[in-house]
Amino acid sequence: MELATDEEFLPVKRVKPQPDWPPSWKESYFYDQGEIYGEISHHGYAYAYDNRWRETLRLLTEVLAPGARILDVAAAQGNFSLALAELGFDVTWNDLRAELADYVRLKHERGKIEFAAGNAFELAFPSLFDAVLITEIIEHVAHPDDFLAKAAALVRPGGYLVMTTPNGGYFKNSLPKFSECADASVFESAQFKPNADGHIFLLHVDEIEPLAKRAGLSVEKIALFTSPLTAGHVKTEPLLKILPRSIVNLAERVSRSLPSALKKRALVQMGVRFRKPN
């Protein structure tokens, strides 16, 4: 399945904020303003989100056709769920915060989407999924090996697990490496916190294969993306405000053509497509 223009994958329906919304809705709308509605306060963040958006959809649509069943774990405001539903996939939205389901429903225009709030690993789904999507989650858990194995258990034989996470090899990362941690349980009290402040481990490329093997998965594709220049990490935010998007996208494409060893140190984000054996 081919990706076309970026706009096709953004939910087009805009909701109007209300003063009586619960706090989680207001927070979700705040992120939607910069991520899908174009009200950008930090251009580097917006470009990084756009890169992750496109890479995530590409990792899925390269191998799955419309009609495939996809579980979006910890889906929050549901933008990936909505986009995939509009592309014709049979999507199940999931999040611990049950009240967010109605916020997602406000933005839903077309496509099949079901809602399953709660701990995805404790819910009784009627069948396994063709793909499970875990975006920006694994860096918030103390035991990424266990998390990956539990997510893999929801995938049918021959199906896929698609993950995005910050690249642990990025030169500005100062967090510990999971594979070098003697006792990850010391981080359990800090897990599940939101945003970058809640990051515990950022996985390195060389950790992906061992984690996949322990989860009974194979690694089909690893994509490194988002230059620190386009993410505004090296004092480029003022430039990003005035540069044409075409120039920013060109800088991003050039960064992805770097030698593999350099990309592991220079690029901010990582996307992985795992496959479960038949």
Which positions does each model-derived feature cover?
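A short acidic, Gly/Pro-enriched loop at the edge of an enzyme's catalytic core
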Residues: 121-132
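A short SAM/SAH-binding and catalytic strip from SAM-dependent methyltransferases
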Residues: 133-142
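Conserved SAM-binding motif I beta-strand of class I
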Residues: 90-95
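Conserved class I S-adenosyl-L-methionine
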Residues: 67-76
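Conserved SAM-binding loop of SAM-dependent methyltransferases across substrates and taxa
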Residues: 77-87
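S-adenosyl-L-methionine-dependent methyltransferase catalytic module, highlighting the catalytic core
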Residues: 5-55, 79, 96-103, 107-108, ...
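Conserved residues in the N-terminal Rossmann fold of short-chain dehydrogenase/reductase
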Residues: 117
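Glycine-rich helix-loop-beta junction characteristic of Rossmann-like nucleotide cofactor-binding loops
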Residues: 58-65
